[in-house]
């Protein structure tokens, strides 16, 4: 799968722009606030139906305009397709090959994408909800059943919480059964995902200090090393029953996958407390590379790999390592304030961005 071109209209600081992309590395450089990150954001919105910078897509509309329009052409299994998103104050419309996409479940996974940016610091120091979102987006791009289970789990959770707030307990058992069935699939999927990410991290994390980097998944539902969905379902059902009195007092559900979390660890110590800022950024880069390889292992296609502001927090040695890995990661977009310090082959493309004007800097080898 390759994205062939991207078109933007009334998006952020772009009144209108179009860019053709290389199937390999696309290196985009320019001063700050010129529109580099906006290109990655546009691809993210097209791929996932949401932004990584705002929860309100209308904030991305060009000043003075009433809408924005994004369109990409991409090739999948040798067949060209068009995907577009239109947003105005009334809502969002998404089309693939002129056919409407009515739900995000239909969209997510069509164009798998991995983003590495400064906002990923939340995976170390942010709230548990940030880390659950990371797993939810990753698994939703790979597993249609996970998307379905997640959607229906939150619906059932909302219904149960409504009953708890109004002290209506007569039908709670119905929702407990749904939560246990759906929640067990979510929990087991996350547990398995973290285990597989850890294997990939160990392959990627290579340093002279022999430090061990891994994800520690935290769930009250995991009671033993060898688990099954039935065992997790029974455990969640038991915990929902045991916490009923407390839940009635709180007016919400205190146990389940919506309370799960994970911690990035290095040598059995939390990265958040025992790593330098530069080391944290390097560790996150490894996690994001593992995320890309995880999607490849399930999709049999590399996701679009985006690295925003690559020089923020990474030294030249680590950047060189990332760029060395990039050709084996499929199509990649990188933004930076400077030109690369190492050679990029003719198969790649370098763009400069200045005041929302995109130009091809060179197709040639740069040293």
Curated annotation (Swiss-Prot):
> Which residues of this UniProt protein bind ATP?
30-37
GO BP terms, alphabetized:
DNA replication; DNA synthesis involved in DNA repair; double-strand break repair; SOS response
What's the main place this protein lives? Answer: cytoplasm
Can you name this protein? DNA replication and repair protein RecF
Tell me the protein family, please. Belongs to the RecF family.
Signal peptide location: none
Q: Which UniProt keywords apply?
A: ATP-binding, Cytoplasm, DNA damage, DNA repair, DNA replication, DNA-binding, Nucleotide-binding, SOS response
Q: Which NCBIfam families match?
A: recf
The molecular function GO annotations come to: ATP binding; single-stranded DNA binding
Q: Relate the protein's function as given in its record.
A: The RecF protein is involved in DNA metabolism; it is required for DNA replication and normal SOS inducibility. RecF binds preferentially to single-stranded, linear DNA. It also seems to bind ATP.
UniProt source species: Chlamydia abortus (strain DSM 27085 / S26/3) (Chlamydophila abortus)
Matches recorded under InterPro entries: DNA-binding_RecF (IPR001238), DNA-binding_RecF_CS (IPR018078), P-loop_NTPase (IPR027417), RecF/RecN/SMC_N (IPR003395), RecF_2 (IPR042174)
């Amino acid at each position: 799968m390759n994205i062939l071109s991207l078109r933007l209209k009334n998006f952020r600081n772009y009144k209108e722009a179009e860019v053709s992309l290389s199937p390999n590395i696309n290196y985009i450089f320019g001063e700050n606030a010129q529109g580099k990150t906006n290109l990655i954001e546009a691809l993210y919105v097209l791929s996932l139906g949401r932004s990584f910078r705002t929860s309100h897509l209308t904030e991305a509309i060009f000043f003075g305009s009433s809408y924005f329009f994004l369109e990409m052409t991409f090739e999948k299994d040798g067949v060209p397709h068009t995907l577009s998103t239109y947003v105005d104050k009334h809502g969002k419309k998404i089309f693939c090959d002129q056919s409407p996409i009515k739900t995000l479940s239909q969209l997510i996974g069509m164009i798998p994408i991995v983003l590495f940016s400064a906002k990923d610091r939340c995976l170390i120091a942010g709230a548990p909800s940030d880390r659950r979102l990371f797993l939810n987006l990753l698994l939703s791009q790979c597993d249609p059943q996970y998307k379905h289970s997640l959607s229906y789990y939150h619906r059932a959770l909302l219904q149960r919480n409504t009953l708890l707030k109004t002290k209506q307990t007569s039908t709670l058992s119905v929702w407990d059964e749904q939560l246990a069935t759906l929640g067990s699939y979510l929990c087991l999927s996350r547990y398995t995902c973290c285990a597989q990410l850890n294997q990939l991290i160990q392959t990627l994390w290579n340093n002279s200090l022999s430090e061990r980097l891994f994800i520690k998944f935290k769930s009250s539902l995991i009671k033993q090393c060898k688990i099954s969905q039935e065992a997790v379902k029974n455990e969640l059902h038991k915990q929902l029953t045991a916490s009923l009195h407390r839940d009635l007092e709180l007016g919400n559900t205190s146990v389940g996958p919506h309370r799960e979390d994970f911690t990035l660890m290095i040598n059995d110590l939390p990265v958040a407390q025992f790593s330098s800022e530069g080391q944290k950024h390097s560790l996150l880069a490894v996690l994001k590379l593992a995320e890309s390889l995880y999607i490849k292992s399930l999709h049999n296609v590399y996701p679009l790999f985006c690295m925003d502001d690559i020089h923020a927090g990474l030294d030249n040695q680590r950047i060189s390592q990332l760029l060395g890995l990039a050709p084996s990661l499929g199509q990649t977009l990188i933004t930076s304030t400077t030109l690369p310090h190492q050679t990029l082959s003719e198969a790649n493309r370098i763009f400069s961005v200045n005041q929302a004007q995109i130009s091809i800097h060179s197709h040639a080898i740069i040293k």
